[in-house]
A protein has these predicted regions:
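Conserved AdoMet/S-adenosylmethionine-binding subsite of the radical SAM
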Residues: 63-249
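C-terminal accessory extensions appended to soluble enzyme cores
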Residues: 225, 230-279
């Protein structure tokens, strides 16, 4: 296929298929793996220089919509009905989204009868497309590494902004989830990377028991250290303790643990292998 692909490794646990509409993401998340992917544009640059370039702007991939139309048409002809996640290596709702490509992509999914799975840190920027996301039968997902800004005080917001400087605030993401729920769109959360296990557990408690917009599905991961700082954080966390505490919270709220990767079912949660096997 031309732009839709089958993820490998850890990403395959999230969805059977994925599509990255853009290159680059100005959310500037320190844990972003996008800059580590192969890209001829980074030739001659240090990793730090390339990270700055990657996080400076969002660029549409050449002919992304035409390629998506072609792939969806081919999948329809093969009766391949697997859902497609948007996006792993970029964000479908960056602050500088060019030409509203994501909305056009969702229209293509609806036209061809495929279910899109959104994963974003753009918060309420995504709400403008909820009409078409619902029509396409899609899911709305967001990444969470921290608790809502107002619950742990100003320090929480400062901590989040240090890691995700230009992403939507956690309260904005919470508001987006509530609006999606009001539209009748299934809502899910990707709870990783875990920077502070207490915040992650507090988030699970709040979001799994929320009376207005209880989440439909959770995918739980950990933190995989990639530099001195994140390796130190990873080493400092008791992952089996975190995993079992998270399971207890979700089971107590009525969620069933599922073990098939890439599945989205209402009332369930999935623990990624890396966290499941952590010792």
């Amino acid at each position: 296929m031309k732009i839709i692909y089958e993820p490998k490794g850890k990403a395959l646990e999230y969805a059977p298929l994925a599509c990255n509409l853009y290159k680059g993401c100005p959310h500037g998340c320190r844990y972003c793996f996008g800059p580590t992917l192969p890209n001829p544009a980074k030739k001659g640059l240090t990793m730090e220089e390339w990270r700055r370039e990657w996080h400076s702007k969002t660029v549409e991939k050449p002919d992304s919509l035409a390629k998506l139309e072609s792939d969806l048409s081919a999948m329809a002809n093969k009766r391949d009905t697997r859902p497609v996640l948007l996006c792993f290596a970029c964000d479908p709702y960056p602050p500088d989204e060019p030409k509203k490509i994501t909305r056009a992509a969702l229209a293509a999914f609806e036209h061809h009868g495929f279910k899109p799975i959104i994963l974003t840190k753009g918060g309420t920027r995504a709400c403008r497309d909820f009409d078409i996301l619902k029509a396409a039968g899609g899911w709305f997902g967001q990444t969470c590494s921290f608790i809502f800004d107002t619950q742990y005080g100003a320090g929480t917001q400062e901590c989040r902004k240090a890691w995700e400087p230009n992403a939507a605030s956690m309260m904005d993401r919470h508001n987006a989830a509530e609006i999606a729920d009001a539209y009748g769109i299934p809502v899910w959360w990707s709870v990783e990377p875990v920077i502070d296990k207490d915040q992650a557990l507090a988030f699970l408690t709040v979001q799994s028991e929320h009376e207005v917009s209880k989440s439909d599905h959770f995918k739980l991961g950990k933190l995989s250290g990639y530099d001195k700082e994140t390796k130190a954080i990873e080493k400092s966390i008791n992952w089996p303790e975190y995993r079992e505490a998270a399971r207890e919270i979700l089971a107590g709220a009525g969620y069933t643990e599922i073990f098939e990767p890439g599945v989205f079912e209402v009332g369930t949660h999935y623990v990624k292998k890396e966290l499941r096997d952590a010792k």
